[in-house]
Swiss-Prot record:
It comes from Lactococcus lactis subsp. lactis (strain IL1403) (Streptococcus lactis). The keyword DNA damage applies. Gene3D superfamilies: P-loop containing nucleotide triphosphate hydrolases (3.40.50.300), UVR domain (4.10.860.10). This is UvrABC system protein B. The UvrABC repair system catalyzes the recognition and processing of DNA lesions. A damage recognition complex composed of 2 UvrA and 2 UvrB subunits scans DNA for abnormalities. Upon binding of the UvrA(2)B(2) complex to a putative damaged site, the DNA wraps around one UvrB monomer. DNA wrap is dependent on ATP binding by UvrB and probably causes local melting of the DNA helix, facilitating insertion of UvrB beta-hairpin between the DNA strands. Then UvrB probes one DNA strand for the presence of a lesion. The gene is uvrB. It is found in: Cytoplasm. A motif (Beta-hairpin) lies at residues 98-121.
Length: 692
């Protein structure tokens, strides 16, 4: 039975802050553009200007159901927590991949190795995914924070909605009919272990535990063949929390199909199987034909008997009634037509949207070619970028450095440059590569005397290692962060840098999440003139931004200045006319286009910020950020003090006990919706296990 979506709920933004700096102008401009029907626009906001708050204000003022996309689970978790705080009275949902571990099905012909799909599902995230889809079908005041997994196939929203079991007191329905209906939407009867997606029966009472809940269930009490009343109960204690007038029970799986559609689907699968077997046999591929026939017939038998089989998603084209090549249903299809999309860190996220389809296609083609899957499995896939675009009603790309794709989509750019703290973008200067290390040593000593920290970025692992060794010889307290360092160690390194255990951090990519240190007053970029990843315009602006959280922020770009430009030389004259040069000690030197654009953009922002501060009498203050002991494994002593534990010095038994304790904390963090904390605890557990 279909349910009607409530359409008159309003977003209610709860915040102790009012828009500050240029947030008010940015909010007004974004809202005006949306109300005037602008399809796409960019919010180009400098680091630390409060873009999430601006996004929240826009959602509240436009009142549209909104999908907020991020490029990884960590960032999505941070955004989800922030939006939950801003909108405590609305439906803020979280939709990311529910796999803690995922090994996709694959075949490697060179070694004749078939790798079966293997995965472990995070029950908490599965609950949140169900909560997201049910909220979208029940109400209009919904914000879903999602990773790129929202463009993967999810099952038909119409089938999902049509399968909802709707119950009201006084409704005529027999108890046995309700039990049949619940089994039909993939609920399991379990009178002993009562958990999500289950129901239990006690005489004339049926208790149902929805897939979107984790603590509360519903008790349906019958009088004959009529529902007497429906109560909400606490699962653990059985305590009655109140009576409800209407209960909508959504399916326990997103992949729903009715009996008639199932028979049609099986007929189509059998027809496709026959067709493909003919192809294989005509090509002399008898092994592939035998393999495909055996595997597919087993799946068909399971579908007939159970309505489900392992890898059922590979038959989703037939189940959904789609034509070959048609895009799958995704989370985007659960939204109403006039919804809004906001893409956070769009320069990263849109690249992922583009890349998902190709990687998936290559793996599946191998499975189809060797008889592990029917060709229709190719239609169980993520959306192509152009298919994603076809779902867009109105979209806001949010980034400090929008990508080429976003810039091609729209000319409407809304800027947010002023930080509420008054902090300015750092001063950027170019210095010669010749003698750069000795020059840098002098700068490091100046910062160390003022108890400030330094980031140094290099191009290669070897250079980082050599530089770190040299700095150590010079008596500088330094550490090197490379890609092999695990999450646990990485966060410990950042904490030690902030505490002053060492003064300089050397690395190649210092743009990862969590590398956010207000104590850093100098960022030195070596080989800044070597174009490429992290030395292009966006990479340079993002790296320069690492010094924007300190009032003394300063950035030095070291570049090749072996030869000064001569305006009498035709080639040099061309460079001078193009503007791609810098002045140093009275001479002009060539710099890259990326360096020039990054420096000009930083200088432009700094000028606007300084003018604003002067007009409003604001003095920039370095951000005061608490140094949390996020990663160091700790335990409370009897006196209540926290004592650090050196895991490497523990016995195997002690480590086992610690793993147990951390797993418990991880579950608690996940239940409290602190997904970033839970992820860090998970990484600790994995690393502790690796020690044994």
């Amino acid at each position: 039975m279909a349910i009607e979506r409530i359409t008159d709920n309003k977003f209610e933004l709860v915040s102790k802050y009012e828009p500050a700096g240029d947030q008010g102008e940015a909010i007004a401009e974004l809202v005006d553009n949306i109300e005037n029907g602008e399809k796409a626009q960019i919010l180009r906001g400098a680091t630390g200007t409060g873009k999430t708050y601006t996004m929240s204000q826009v959602i509240a003022r436009t009142g549209k159901p909104t999908l907020v996309m991020a490029h990884n689970k960590t960032l999505a978790g941070q955004l989800y927590s922030e939006f939950k705080e801003f909108f405590p009275n609305n439906a803020v949902e979280y939709f990311v991949s529910y796999y803690d571990y995922y090994q996709p099905e694959a075949y490697v012909p060179s070694s004749d190795t078939y790798i079966e799909k293997d995965s472990s599902v995070n029950d908490e995230i599965d609950k949140l995914r169900h909560s997201a889809t049910s909220s979208l079908l029940e109400r209009n005041d919904v914000i879903v924070v999602a990773s790129v997994s929202c463009i993967y196939g999810l099952g038909s929203p119409k089938e999902y909605q049509d399968s909802v079991v709707s119950l009201r007191p006084g409704q005529e329905i027999s108890r046995d009919q309700l039990l049949n209906d619940l089994v039909g939407i993939q609920f399991e009867r379990n009178d002993i272990d009562f958990q999500r997606g289950c129901f239990r029966v006690r005489g004339d009472v049926v208790e149902v535990f929805p897939a979107s809940r984790d603590e509360h269930a519903f008790r349906v009490e019958f009088f004959g063949d009529e529902i007497d009343r429906i109560r909400e109960i606490e699962v653990l204690t059985g305590q009655v929390l109140g009576e409800v007038d209407h209960l909508a029970i959504f399916p326990a799986t997103h992949f729903m199909t009715n009996d008639d559609r199932m028979e049609e689907s099986i007929a189509k699968i059998e027809a496709e199987l026959e067709e493909q077997l003919k192809v294989f046999r005509s090509e002399g591929k008898l092994l592939e034909a035998q393999r495909l026939e055996q595997r597919t017939n087993y799946d068909i038998e399971m579908l007939r008997e159970m309505g489900y089989c392992n890898g059922v998603e590979n038959y989703s084209r037939h189940m959904d009634g789609r034509e070959e090549g048609e895009p799958p249903y995704t989370l985007l299809d659960f939204f109403p037509d006039d919804f809004m999309i906001m893409i956070d860190e769009s320069h990263m996220t849109m690249g992922q949207v583009k890349g998902m389809y190709n990687g998936d296609r290559a793996r599946k083609e191998m499975l189809c070619n060797y008889g592990f899957r029917l060709p229709s499995a190719l239609d169980n896939r993520p959306l192509k970028r152009e298919e994603f675009e076809s779902h867009v009603h109105q979209i806001v790309y949010v980034s400090a450095t929008p990508g080429d794709y976003e810039m091609e989509q729209t000319d409407t750019i809304v800027e947010q440059i002023i930080r509420p703290t008054g902090l300015l973008d750092p001063v950027v200067e170019v210095r010669p590569m010749m003698g750069q290390i000795d020059d840098l040593v002098g700068e490091i000593h100046k910062r160390a005397e003022k108890n400030e920290r330094v980031f140094v970025t290099t191009l290669t692992k070897k250079m980082s290692e050599d530089l770190t060794a040299y700095f150590k010889e010079m008596g500088i307290k330094v550490k090197y962060m490379h890609s092999d360092i695990k999450t646990l160690e990485r966060t410990e390194i950042i904490r030690d840098l902030r505490l002053g255990v060492f003064d300089v951090l050397v690395g190649i990519n210092l743009l990862r999440e969590g590398i956010d240190v207000p104590e850093v007053s100098l960022v030195a970029i070596l080989d800044a003139d070597k174009e490429g990843f992290l030395r292009n315009e966006r990479g340079l602006i993002q790296t320069i931004g690492r010094a924007a959280r300190n009032s003394e922020g300063h950035v030095i770009l070291y570049s090749d200045m072996a030869k000064a430009l001569d305006e009498n030389d035709p080639v040099d004259k061309e460079i001078l006319d193009s503007g791609y040069y810098t002045e140093y000690e009275g001479q002009k030197y060539k710099i890259t286009r990326s360096m020039k654009h990054a420096m000009d953009e930083t200088a432009r922002r700094r000028e606007i910020q300084m003018a604003y501060n002067e007009e409003h009498g604001i003095t920039p203050q370095t951000i005061k950020k608490e140094i949390r002991d996020l990663i160091a494994i700790t335990k409370k002593t009897d006196s209540g003090e926290i004592e650090e534990v050196d895991a490497s010095a523990m016995t195997k038994k002690e480590r086992k006990a610690l793993v147990k304790k951390l797993e418990k904390e991880m579950q608690q963090a996940a239940s409290a919706l602190d997904f970033e904390g839970a992820a860090q605890l998970r990484d600790m557990v994995l690393e502790l296990r690796a020690m044994d």
